[in-house]
Amino acid sequence: MSLDFTVVIPARLRSTRLPGKPLLLIAGKPMVQHVWEQARKSGAGRVVIATDDASIVEACQAFGAEVLMTRADHESGTDRLAEVAAQLGLPADAIVVNVQGDEPLIPPVIIDQVAANLAAHPEAGIATLAEPIHDPETVFNPNAVKVVSDKNGLALSFSRAPLPWARDAFAKDRNQLPQGVPYRRHIGMYAYRVGFLQDFVSWGPCWLEQTEALEQLRALWHGVRIHVADAIEAPAVGVDTAQDLERVRRLLEA
């Protein structure tokens, strides 16, 4: 029996690094349409775009997507998801996958993977994914979020800083990674149960989440277990900057 889950794609027009990001054209389509098309290839029973901007609603309706208007004052994409789950009337045990609206090349297979991982780990409140890092540039890039997990695959911490900090190795040379240290980049896709989303919103943001601008730290702060698996297919570049946008355009317009 296939797993039933819903994909929600949060899409905000007011990106700090790349304004108007969801509607920027890639190969003749808005970025959010590429994300929606990839999500529709997954096993999700329903794919919904969530936004607080009327122009995004109009654009999404034009290409046939189900789109919901949400409040504009949410602290994070997860808070927005909770409102969507309430609007859709989803039960507490329903699984919702948050697919970022700036991942136009997201592999559908890893959307299925993260939903299945949450279903397989009832001790976890969240499931998410990561991939190995092999170069120091990514480790020191604050736009690449690093994650460290315990022996059971549960997250210990996330950070925009190098994590872990290889004290002795980096004191000598920051241009190469130390042997035997498994650096991993967090892939910003999450699976949740609706009941957890309700708890998440009720807690409100914590100082650690606000300092790093990483919403998953709110969950760790409150003792929630986050299961982290290596993605079975590494996603191509997401779009955080104008340079990322040009790389994705070259890939999709080739």
Curated annotation (Swiss-Prot):
Record-stated family: Belongs to the KdsB family.
Enzyme Commission code(s) on record: 2.7.7.38
Superkingdom of source: Bacteria
Annotated GO biological process: CMP-keto-3-deoxy-D-manno-octulosonic acid biosynthetic process; lipopolysaccharide biosynthetic process
Top-level enzyme category: transferase
InterPro entries according to UniProt: Cytidylyl_trans, KdsB, Nucleotide-diphossugar_trans
Pfam families, alphabetized: CTP_transf_3
Localization annotation: Cytoplasm
Pathway, per record: Nucleotide-sugar biosynthesis; CMP-3-deoxy-D-manno-octulosonate biosynthesis; CMP-3-deoxy-D-manno-octulosonate from 3-deoxy-D-manno-octulosonate and CTP: step 1/1; Bacterial outer membrane biogenesis; lipopolysaccharide biosynthesis
GO cellular component, one term: cytosol
Catalytic reactions of this protein: 3-deoxy-alpha-D-manno-oct-2-ulosonate + CTP = CMP-3-deoxy-beta-D-manno-octulosonate + diphosphate
Function: Activates KDO (a required 8-carbon sugar) for incorporation into bacterial lipopolysaccharide in Gram-negative bacteria.
The protein's name: 3-deoxy-manno-octulosonate cytidylyltransferase
Classification via NCBIfam families: kdsB, PRK05450.1-3, PRK05450.1-5, PRK13368.1
GO molecular function: 3-deoxy-manno-octulosonate cytidylyltransferase activity
Keywords tagged on the record: Cytoplasm, Lipopolysaccharide biosynthesis, Nucleotidyltransferase, Transferase
